[in-house]
Amino acid sequence: MRSVHVRLILASVFVVALCALAATQGRQPPDPGKALTTTMTTVNQQILDMAEDFPADKYNFKATPEVRSFAEVMVHVMSGTAYAAKAGRGENVQWSELDPKAYSGKPAIVAALKKAIADNDSTLKATPATRFAASPEPWLAVIEHTAEHYGQLVVYYRLNGIVPPASRPKK
């Protein structure tokens, strides 16, 4: 009687295992490169939306005198995006802070930010999946750092009585 129960249990486990195996057939394994690219694209688009939306006459706004202005934060974020593209291509690069004074106002910053994002997007698309599986750097660090500054920029928006683009009702 006991051996019948053991066989029944083993048969049940076997059937469950077979069902689980069948359920996973045809599914693609997770793609870290795709996840990273999607996240980087999202955070870059949020930053670009802010750069395009924030009033030009407020680009020099600072929450307090000792912090970066809106324009300086945008150039700082652009520095990270440019760094990610270069490091992602395997270039021997150090974080080289771009000089905010090199960009004269909103149009120049928005144009340079678009260029940095496009360069980074091209690098991400050209990067083989095996590279992402081995290490998500430099993109993961830049995504995290950019997200911190996104939060800072939300505060700049709110201090100016403006609702950030991502917080506005969808049309």
Predicted features, each with a name:
Residues K101-T146:
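Acidic/histidine-rich alpha-helical segments that form the ligand environment
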Residues T37-L48, K58-E97, T130-K171:
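Short, contiguous alpha-helical
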Residues G26, T41-Q45, K101-A102, I109-A111:
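Carbohydrate-interacting regions of secretory-pathway proteins
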Residues Q28-M40:
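N-terminal beta-strand motif that seeds the catalytic metal site of vicinal oxygen chelate
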Residues M1-V6:
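N-terminal secretory signal peptides that target proteins for export/translocation
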Residues I9-A20:
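Bacterial N-terminal signal peptides
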Residues A20-P29:
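Bacterial Sec-dependent signal peptides at the C-terminal "C-region" and cleavage site
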